[in-house]
Design a protein with these regions (language model features):
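Conserved AMP-binding/adenylate-forming core of the ANL superfamily
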Residues: 12, 20-65, 69-73, 90-95, ...
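Conserved pre-ATP/AMP-binding loop-to-beta segment of ANL
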Residues: 19, 142-143, 153-174, 181, ...
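Conserved AMP-binding A3 loop
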Residues: 32-35, 170-194
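A short helix-loop-beta submotif of the ANL/AMP-binding
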Residues: 56-57, 63-83, 87-91, 99-105, ...
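ATP-dependent adenylate-forming carboxylate-activation enzymes
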Residues: 62, 83-96, 110-115, 214, ...
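ANL superfamily adenylate-forming
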Residues: 114-166, 272-273
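Gly/Ser/Thr-rich phosphate-binding loop
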Residues: 147, 231, 256-261, 270-322
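Conserved AMP-binding/adenylation subdomain of ANL enzymes
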Residues: 193-210, 218-258, 268, 272-273
Length: 322
């Protein structure tokens, strides 16, 4: 008997084993795993109610947020393909990617509706425009994410027929396009599932881990952390923007045990003034990739703070860890 390797199994496992455990901390929002699962189901059902169907591409343009995390599982369990966008790009880049990927629906953080409105008329295939905001009404010509969830069922959506296979697409992740246009890397359930297992093994991720999201979730599906940490039943502590003092405060308050980042973020942490005023009871693992950090950064992390350093390597085309 063969069992397909599906990324949706990570959330199902966490809900089954840890329904009352904290899954997400995002500002004032705290969701247990059963609550996260309900929001995921509501979004899946809302997207189906809009007429989206298996194989359709749905993009998300957002900084780190609980909305972003929800989108990974809500699209995957009904056979949609998620296209995460880099919110640092300009409108022309978004126009190219959205048309190249054949996106049918856009999920956009409230801060970024303007950049999409600039190119709305150049996106002939997009039929649905959904904005994620915690409160307030949606801007003109946008539908509210939370309003869609409120009107949708929290029950699991109908299972696709035939059942989703492990070699079906789960996301299309665009590279930076260093020498030409960005390339769309087509990730399957199997790609992302095995990468998550690689991450769990290499980083020693466990059920009592608490990850601080210093890494953008759009970056190759958060290097796979959206799947790996969820599958183990850990807690996601969301950071919308890099701020050294905020990072230390969240590590202290939430008991953060690891974070993934580029060397520039590590430097922001090390250069935070008056670091010793924070009472930190954990010994976080700082996982760095993207470029080799200076040896002095590693020494400072281990000597000044007593934290652990891990270096990893990968690229979008390998899902991404090697």
């Amino acid at each position: 008997m063969e069992v397909p390797l599906l990324v949706t199994d990570f959330l199902r496992r966490a809900v089954r084993l840890y329904p009352e455990k904290t899954a997400v901390v995002d500002g004032a929002n705290r969701y247990r795993y059963r609550e996260l699962d309900e929001r995921v189901n509501r979004l899946s059902n809302a997207l189906l109610d809009l007429g989206l169907s298996r194989g359709d591409r749905v993009c998300i343009l957002s900084p780190n947020s609980h909305f972003f995390l929800e989108s990974f599982y809500a699209t995957a369990q009904i056979g949609l393909v998620l296209v995460p966008l880099n919110y640092r790009l300009v409108a022309a880049d978004h126009e190219y990617i959205l048309n190249h990927a054949g996106v049918s629906a856009v999920l956009v953080d409230g801060e970024y509706t303007g950049v999409i409105d600039e190119i709305r008329d150049a996106l002939p295939k997009v039929q649905h425009w959904i904005v994620a905001t915690e409160e307030g009404e949606a801007p003109p010509r946008w539908q509210s994410w939370n309003a869609l969830l409120a009107s949708a069922s929290p029950e699991p959506p109908p299972r696709p027929e035939p059942e989703i296979g492990e070699n079906e697409l789960v996301s299309i992740n665009y590279t930076s396009g260093t020498t030409s246009r960005p390339k769309g890397v087509m990730m399957t359930h199997r790609n992302c599932y095995l990468n998550a297992y690689n991450m769990i093994a290499h980083l020693g991720i466990a059920h009592d881990d608490v990850e601080l999201w210093t890494l953008p979730m759009f970056h190759c599906n958060g290097w796979g952390g959206v799947y790996a940490l969820t599958g183990m039943g850990g807690a996601h502590v969301i950071l919308r923007a890099i701020d050294g003092e905020r990072i230390f405060r969240l590590i202290a308050d939430e008991g953060v045990t690891f974070a993934c980042m580029a060397p520039a973020v590590l430097r922001a942490v090390l250069d935070t003034p008056d670091k010793q005023r924070f009472e930190i009871r954990t010994r976080p693992r700082f996982v760095v990739a993207g470029a080799p950090p200076p040896a002095a950064f590693i020494e400072r992390l281990e000597t000044e703070l007593g934290w652990q350093f891990l270096q990893i390597y990968g690229l979008t085309e390998t899902a991404p860890l090697l």
